[in-house]
Amino acid sequence: MTPADLAVFDILGPMAYDVELADRLRELLADEHEVTEKQMFGGLAFLIAGHMAVCAGSRGDLLLRVDPAQTDALIEDPRASRYVMRGREMNGWLGVETDASMSDDELGRWVDHGVAFVRSLPPK
């Protein structure tokens, strides 16, 4: 760890998100424009034009923002569920169980949903 990493570690404690998942997300988003990373929701979020598209979540899952009208269809996938934060379902947000068995293509399809939705929003 660098001194800067240690300073962050001292303030925030250990990183709670899945570093491998964050790296995979970073690769999948490499060709996107206006991508920034920010610690949010106990994880590492990837924002596009200021809007959070996907996040390597604190539970080892993928958190993504989707068109609320597509939520019911998307949660038919057994890996996906409505995201719950502090006991409240978040409209337009999904949690997707990820693990090493999830292919890059499958992960990419989920990321595409998040990217497509935030690209439909005006930049912040």
List each language-model region with its residue ranges:
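Charge-dense, helix-prone N-terminal extensions
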Residues: M1-K124
